[in-house]
């Protein structure tokens, strides 16, 4: 996919720098994203493409975060986000520190407004409302989602697309890590909740063409943001 001159943006999955080895994060985590950003910057510059760089274990001020970041084709870091929702079933809070800031809307080199979140964040629909209402047209979810809950992955991604009338891209790991099998099934979903393309359980690249105008059309047809009454939801 990196060799396709027409590619605007490349997406990587969650925790690609060391896998999901929570017990080893103290020794394997990056420091202030130094190694990870250098590596991704070189790729972005070499191939002249924006990169939604998945997430990495990242040590900052004696705390380890699960940090997603994005770099544009000039090598500039254009977004950084620390995973807010840590998975209690996997004891993530014992190894990681939760982020305190909601995901931001940021622009790709082509001017498209996007946002990014990490794995378990997908279960919290409130989180996407903020960037969606500020103009984000694509939400990238990077993950290591297990096969045991593949149905949840597929349904929730569709739900986020439909709720916010936007494109949702899910980039998930695959294969095994110890006894855990990851679901794969990276997927692109349009603002109507329809699958554009989807992978299976094996490692492969997925190339998708997106019509950004479809977001505006869908938001005009079903103006959910105009109908929100947040003061009544408290």
Swiss-Prot record:
Which family is it part of?
Answer: Belongs to the carbon-nitrogen hydrolase superfamily. NIT1/NIT2 family.
Q: What is the lineage of its organism?
A: Bacteria, Bacillati, Bacillota, Bacilli, Bacillales
CN hydrolase domain ranges (all copies)? 1-212
- Name this protein carries in UniProt: Hydrolase in agr operon
Q: Which InterPro entries match?
A: C-N_Hydrolase (IPR003010), C-N_Hydrolase_sf (IPR036526), UPF0012_CS (IPR001110)
Query: In this UniProt entry, which cysteines form S-S bonds?
Result: none
Tell me which CDD domains the record gives.
Answer: nitrilase_5
Active site annotated at which positions? 14, 83, 119
